[in-house]
C-alpha cells in the first residue's frame, strides 16, 4: 500500500514539482506520496561542425570558394535559390555565430593534428601564398573550411533539390517546436544522398539527421503541447482516483494530435533521416562521431555524450562499430612465454586461446618504471606500478595448476573459439589501427603481443556475433564479455564531437510556433514510501525528513583544486542529486539559478573540467517551470501507464524500419495494449 509522506517538511521544494502527486490513480486520498529527488529533463544538442557544413553548403559558402575565379554572373547563378540565414533576427544571428565558432574549433583541432605530423612543411606553402593575388588570398582555408572538408567525407555533397534547403530561410525558431524541427530535418535529409538513399545502414554510416533517445517522450510531449498543455486533451488523465483513457479510445483530441505529429515524422522517416534508440544504442554513440546533425536526450547523460581528446572505437569486420568500452582489456595471442600457460604436457599445447591482464588487487602496489614479468610468467608490473595478473583463456579444459575464476576461463562457444584462432593465425593484422614505423625487432615483438580480441566488464549487450558472454572471474560484480572480429580505431579529435563544439538548446517546447504554452518533461526516479505498520511508517517519514532537510558534512573533490578533498555541508538529497548529475528541485536552487550557473563555470574553469552544459540548461528549464513560465509534463501514474508508454514506443520505432502508414501503426499499437485500456 501507498504511504502518504505526512509530517515531512517539503517547504524547501518548489511546489510545481510536487503537482504530479495529483495524477496518481488508485490512492485513498490526495497527498504527497512521491518526492522528486533526482530530476532531469531533455535537451536538443546541435552538432556544431556538422550543422555548419550543412548550412554553409546550402547557402553556397563552399561553392563560392570554388568559383571565385569565375565571372561575377556565374557566382550569382551559383548562389541563386541558396539557403538564407535570417541574421536580422538577433537570436538567429547569435546561434549562427555559435555554430561557426564550433566549426572553427573543430577545424583548428584537425590543423593542429596535421602540424604535429608535418612539422615545418607549411613554410613553402606560406611562401607560395604570398605570391597569389589578394582575391585568391581570401580563399585561404580557415578552421571552418577545414572542418567542412572533414565533415564532407562522411556526409557527402550537398544537393540543391526541391523541398530541400533550396531557397529555405534558416532561423533559430526551427528548434523551438516539433513541427518546424521535423520539417527542417526532412529538408536536410532530401539534400544529401548519403541519407535519403540508404535504407540499410552500417554502424559507420551517417545514421540520419535527428536522433531521439526516447520516442515515447517525444510523442507524449508533442501531443501534450498540441493539446495546450492540458491533461484533459492528453491520451489519458487521472480523474476521481482512476485513469481515464477515453480521449484516446474515442479518437478525440489526443488521437487527432498524434495523427498530425505522426505525419510530420513520416516525412523524415521516409527519407531515412530519423535515428531512434531501440534499446541501448543511444544517439550520442553516433553524434559524437559526426553521424547525426543533432539529437534529443536526457540531461543526465552529459558525460556520455561527447568524445575525449583521443576517442577510440572498436570497428567490426562487417563495418559496424561500438565506442571503446570502459573496463576493457586486450586479449593477446599465445606466445612462447604464455603458450604453455603452466602446462606440463604437449597434449595441451593448442589448448590455450589467448591471455589478458587485470590488476591484481591482492598484491601491494609498488612503484616501478616499466613493465616486468615475474619468473613464473603470470605476474607483472604495469608502468603505473600496479601489480598485474595474467588470465588464461582455454578451449578444451583448464589444465592442472590453473584455477577457474582465479586465473583461468574456459571458453565453450565454438564461434568465439574459431574467431580467436583465426585472428591469431592472420598475418599482418593488428588489433589497433595506428601509424607506426616498426623495425624488424619491434615487428617480432608486436607479433608476440598480437591482439586477437578484447574482454570487458562494461555494460555491453551480447549479440552472439561479435560480443559474447563468458564466465566471470571470482568476485567480479559485473558480467564479463568477450569481443571478437574487432579492430581498435584511434580517431582524430576533428572526427569527433567535443562538448565545446555542441550548441545545447531545450528540447522543443511546443508542437507549433503558434501554441500558447511551453512544455518541458520532468523525469527520473522519485522517493516513494511503502506502508508497513504505524511504527515503521513513522520511522520511514523520519528518514525522508532527514534525507531532505538535515545538512551533513561530505568530503568532496568536485570543487577543490588539484582534486584534493574538501568538506561541504549539504543534505543527503543534495549530495545524491549532484553526484548523479541530477537536480533536486529546491526553491533556492531556482532563485539563485544564474548565480549557481556562474559558480559552476568558475569551478570547472579552475579545475580544468568540462562545463556540464546539460545541467546548466536543465536549471534554466526548471527555473521556468518553478516560475510558471513553462508547464511541466510527466506521465500520469497508473498500473497501465508503463504498457501504454512501451507500446507506443516500440510500435513507433518499428515504423522507422517498416515505413508503414498511420493506420497500420495505430492498429498495431492498440493491439499491443490489450483489453485493459
Curated annotation (Swiss-Prot):
Residues 104-147, 331-384 are annotated as: Disordered. InterPro entries: Lipoprotein_10_C, Mycoplasma_lipoprotein_cen_dom, P68-like. Residues 121-137, 340-353 have a biased composition (Low complexity). Residues 104-120, 358-372 have a biased composition (Basic and acidic residues). Belongs to the MG185/MG260 family. This is Uncharacterized protein MPN_364.
Amino acid at each position: 500500500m501507498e504511504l502518504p509522506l505526512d509530517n515531512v517538511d517539503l517547504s524547501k521544494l518548489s511546489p510545481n514539482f510536487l503537482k504530479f502527486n495529483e495524477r496518481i490513480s488508485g490512492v485513498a486520498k490526495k497527498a504527497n506520496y512521491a518526492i522528486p529527488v533526482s530530476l532531469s529533463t531533455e535537451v536538443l544538442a546541435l552538432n556544431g561542425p556538422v550543422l555548419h557544413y550543412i548550412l554553409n553548403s546550402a547557402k553556397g559558402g563552399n561553392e563560392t570558394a570554388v568559383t571565385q575565379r569565375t565571372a561575377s554572373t556565374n557566382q550569382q547563378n551559383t548562389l541563386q535559390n541558396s539557403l538564407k540565414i535570417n541574421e536580422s533576427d538577433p537570436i538567429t544571428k547569435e546561434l549562427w555565430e555559435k555554430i561557426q565558432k564550433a566549426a572553427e574549433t573543430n577545424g583548428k583541432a584537425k590543423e593542429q593534428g596535421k602540424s604535429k605530423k608535418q612539422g615545418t612543411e607549411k613554410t613553402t606553402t606560406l611562401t607560395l601564398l604570398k605570391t597569389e593575388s589578394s582575391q585568391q588570398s581570401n580563399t585561404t582555408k580557415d578552421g571552418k573550411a577545414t572542418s567542412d572538408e572533414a565533415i564532407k567525407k562522411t556526409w557527402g555533397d550537398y544537393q540543391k533539390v526541391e523541398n530541400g534547403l533550396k531557397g529555405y530561410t534558416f532561423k533559430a525558431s526551427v528548434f523551438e517546436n516539433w513541427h518546424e524541427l521535423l520539417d527542417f530535418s526532412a529538408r536536410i535529409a532530401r539534400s544529401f544522398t548519403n541519407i535519403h538513399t540508404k535504407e540499410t545502414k552500417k554502424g559507420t554510416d551517417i545514421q540520419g539527421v535527428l536522433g531521439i533517445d526516447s520516442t515515447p517522450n517525444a510523442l507524449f510531449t508533442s501531443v501534450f503541447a498540441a493539446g495546450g498543455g492540458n491533461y484533459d486533451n492528453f491520451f489519458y488523465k487521472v480523474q476521481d482516483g482512476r485513469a481515464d483513457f477515453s480521449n484516446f479510445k474515442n479518437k478525440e483530441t489526443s488521437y487527432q494530435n498524434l495523427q498530425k505529429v505522426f505525419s510530420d515524422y513520416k516525412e523524415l522517416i521516409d527519407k531515412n533521416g530519423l535515428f531512434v534508440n531501440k534499446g541501448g544504442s543511444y544517439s550520442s554513440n553516433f553524434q559524437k562521431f559526426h553521424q547525426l546533425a543533432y539529437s534529443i536526450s536526457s540531461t543526465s547523460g552529459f558525460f556520455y555524450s561527447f568524445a575525449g581528446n583521443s576517442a577510440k572505437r572498436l570497428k567490426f569486420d562487417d563495418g559496424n562499430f561500438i565506442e571503446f568500452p570502459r573496463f576493457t582489456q586486450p586479449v593477446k595471442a599465445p606466445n612462447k612465454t604464455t603458450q604453455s600457460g603452466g602446462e606440463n604436457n604437449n597434449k595441451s599445447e593448442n589448448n590455450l586461446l589467448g591471455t589478458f591482464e587485470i590488476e591484481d588487487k591482492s598484491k601491494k602496489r609498488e612503484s616501478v618504471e616499466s613493465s616486468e614479468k615475474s619468473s613464473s610468467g603470470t605476474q607483472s608490473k604495469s608502468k603505473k606500478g600496479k601489480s598485474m595478473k595474467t588470465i588464461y583463456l582455454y578451449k578444451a579444459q583448464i589444465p592442472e595448476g590453473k584455477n577457474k575464476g582465479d586465473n583461468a576461463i574456459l571458453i565453450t562457444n565454438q564461434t568465439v573459439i574459431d574467431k580467436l584462432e583465426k585472428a591469431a593465425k592472420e598475418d599482418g593484422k593488428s588489433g589497433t589501427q595506428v601509424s607506426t614505423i616498426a623495425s624488424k625487432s619491434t615487428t617480432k615483438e608486436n607479433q608476440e603481443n598480437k591482439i586477437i580480441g578484447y574482454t570487458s566488464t562494461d555494460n555491453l549487450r551480447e549479440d552472439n556475433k561479435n560480443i559474447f558472454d563468458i564466465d566471470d572471474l571470482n568476485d567480479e560484480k559485473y558480467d564479463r564479455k568477450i569481443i571478437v572480429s574487432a579492430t581498435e580505431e584511434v580517431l582524430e579529435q576533428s572526427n569527433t564531437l567535443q562538448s565545446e563544439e555542441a550548441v545545447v538548446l531545450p528540447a522543443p517546447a511546443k508542437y507549433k510556433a503558434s501554441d500558447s504554452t511551453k512544455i518541458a518533461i520532468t523525469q527520473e526516479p522519485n522517493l516513494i514510501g511503502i506502508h508497513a505498520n504505524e511504527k515503521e511508517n513513522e520511522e520511514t517519514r523520519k528518514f525522508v525528513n532527514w534525507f531532505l532537510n538535515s545538512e551533513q558534512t561530505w568530503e568532496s573533490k568536485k570543487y577543490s583544486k588539484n582534486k584534493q578533498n574538501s568538506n561541504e555541508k549539504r543534505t543527503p538529497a543534495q549530495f545524491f542529486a549532484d553526484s548523479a548529475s541530477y537536480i533536486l528541485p529546491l526553491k533556492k536552487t531556482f532563485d539563485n539559478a544564474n548565480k549557481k550557473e556562474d559558480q559552476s563555470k568558475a569551478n570547472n574553469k579552475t579545475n580544468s573540467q568540462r562545463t556540464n552544459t546539460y545541467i546548466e540548461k536543465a536549471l534554466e528549464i526548471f527555473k521556468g517551470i518553478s516560475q510558471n513560465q513553462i508547464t511541466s509534463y510527466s506521465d500520469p501514474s497508473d498500473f497501465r501507464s508503463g504498457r501504454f508508454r512501451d507500446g507506443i514506443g516500440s510500435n513507433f520505432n518499428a515504423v522507422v524500419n517498416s515505413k508503414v502508414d498511420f493506420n497500420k501503426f495505430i492498429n498495431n499499437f492498440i493491439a499491443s495494449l490489450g483489453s485493459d485500456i
